[in-house]
Amino acid sequence: MLLPRMLEEVVLAVPARDYDRVVAGLAVEGIFHVDSPPQGVKGEVDRSYRALLTQASERSSRIRQYFDLAGVEPYRVSGVEIEVGGWGESWKRYLEKYSGVEKFYSGLLEEYSEAEARLKELLDIEARIAPVAHLDVDIARLYRSGAFDFAVYYGSYSEGLESRVGEIVSRVGGLAAVEASGGSVVVAVAVPKGALSKISPEILRLNLSIYTPPEGVPGSPREAMEYIRGEKARLGRRLVSIQEMASERLGELAEFYTVVTAFENIFKFLVSTLRRGETRIVRGFVDVRDSGRLRSIVDRMTRGSYVLLSLGVRRGGEAPIPSKVDLPQFLKPFSRVVELYGYPEPNEIVPTVFLAITLPLTFALMFPDAGQGLLVLLFSLFYLRRVSRDWAYVIAVMGGASVVSGLLAGEVFGPLVSKMLGLPELWYRLGLETPPYAMPTYAIDHGEEELVPVLVYRALNVSLFMGAFMLSFGTFLGVVNGVIKRDWVGLVESRLPRFLLFASITGPFLVYMDAGEAGSVLRQALLELGGDSIAAKLVLAGSVLGLAWMLLAGPIIYMLEGHSPLAGLANSFLEAYESLLMLVGNIPSFLRIMALALAHSSLMFVIYYLTVMIMQGGILADVVGALLYVGGNLAVAAMEGLLAFAHASRLHFYEWFSKFYSGTGVPYTPIKVEGVRIKIAGQTF
């Protein structure tokens, strides 16, 4: 769970007559990750399978578009049987079998794309017409006139515009009409043939733009807008109709997708296979737990006529190997977040377990409102779940965490609902002057302004504690990764001294959990050389030792390796400089936790007071105030929820992962056909 699984690298050689059965057996079991052919072994790859793999991959991608058209995630069905007499011939036969389904969805997708393109075109035309939409004149016809030049300009109105336009047009014996409305203006100009090109640059310099009648719509802007509205409505209905039609044959589409992805995986196996006479050779990786199963399957498929060469069991090394990550089911969705940064290497700690705790916690501290957290939770369960189950699970957990932090902050849809539910009184009954995570606006709302500095200070402590923990823990995990990778040089040169430096500086925030106390210790350590404080002296000693270690380790290691120590000194200087920059930049970066929490409570406080002010004018005012409060909650939940997720992810990716996690691994993807039985020569797998 904390480390990728140990994998065994094997080279498998089997007779050509048995190879199809071996491929089918291993694909059904899904335990063998096929890699590039073994180096140094003579043989050739059947290039025809590359073309078939390309076809299957393109088909698979296209089918996923068909699922998107129906508004559902791609899925496979079980119980599908593929009868194989030859992989290439069978592929063509099954394409023919499902050609009707493919033609149906291909036509729908083409029609949908055309309707979408037309809708986008109409929206662009609508935006162009909007400035002159009130004109009920066939402008396009006037533009085509052979007797005179005509043009319409639009823009922002400025004092004296009429006289300046009139002066410009009169010089060529033309006419101009200026219509101002609010801060906007429309100018129509008619001049003798050929004169427009002479005066148009001057008119454009008045901060006006020229209107060009779009093609394909009525020439009158007002009629064009009515036409566009009608077309938009018609196209909208057609798009909905196409999506409904796409849902009618999802069962057949899922079966087709199951077959196509099965062939796609089989072809991935075959393109990595070497042909050498009557022998087929393939190289790959298997989980050490499945080594026995692999040998048993191959032995059964070949009746003992095979050679399996083990190249060793390892977790990483010079040659790249895939990473197999095993996680409990309740943690797997969080791997989607980790994979946004990158996949773990086989010899580094998998951060998913830790992230599943720290990401919801960070999000909740930034977004402390039980009501809006509940909205996030419900949004995940009832909408996002249809788009992605994994992301719905992650967001639901984060929403649930916000429900808890909101209760601790005394916030449920802002102050108004919190008071209606009696949440502030609950904390009073528990013997607390304020809720444990109350924001400064809570004190202002309850007439306890003297508590504002206390609550700001409390939020500051929480932010700095989280930052200190994640930074020190991240550099510690960097040390652990160095040990796992046996990167002894990297450990001595950078990982250990960086951990010592970070632990020394962040330690006071963890020990005292008080920004003032921690700041006092750091001040004595850095400005008074420790003063009379033992803690400050420890901080100073750790910091100086960490920096000195970082600066000296490089030159010494370079010298021991027979290189110039000056090159090592330059590298060490950059390492020390980068570490100091991280310290200076990363710790304050965690103050965004406090900043977003304060911003959220302030927004809700403003909405609350506006609502209270409005709701003092009768029934209608009460309705308006209620709508404002509900709409404000929805807007803040959407905006602040997105911001909190973005900033929580940033703290993990840039401030935390950069200390220990590379994310440059390759996932272990065994060849696997899901929901498929393969029948070869009367034998079913």
Curated annotation (Swiss-Prot):
Component of the A-type ATP synthase that produces ATP from ADP in the presence of a proton gradient across the membrane. One of its GO terms (cellular component) is plasma membrane. Keywords: Cell membrane, Hydrogen ion transport, Ion transport, Membrane, Transmembrane, Transmembrane helix, Transport. This is A-type ATP synthase subunit I. The chain crosses the membrane at residues 172-192, 348-368, 394-414, 464-484, 538-558, 604-624, 626-646. GO terms for biological process: vacuolar acidification. Its main location: membrane. InterPro entries: V-ATPase_116kDa_su (IPR002490). It is a multi-pass membrane protein. Has multiple subunits with at least A(3), B(3), C, D, E, F, H, I and proteolipid K(x). The keyword Transport applies. Pfam families: V_ATPase_I. The lineage of its organism: Archaea, Thermoproteota, Thermoprotei, Desulfurococcales, Desulfurococcaceae. GO terms for molecular function: ATPase binding; proton-transporting ATPase activity, rotational mechanism. Belongs to the V-ATPase 116 kDa subunit family. It is found in: Cell membrane. It comes from the Archaea.
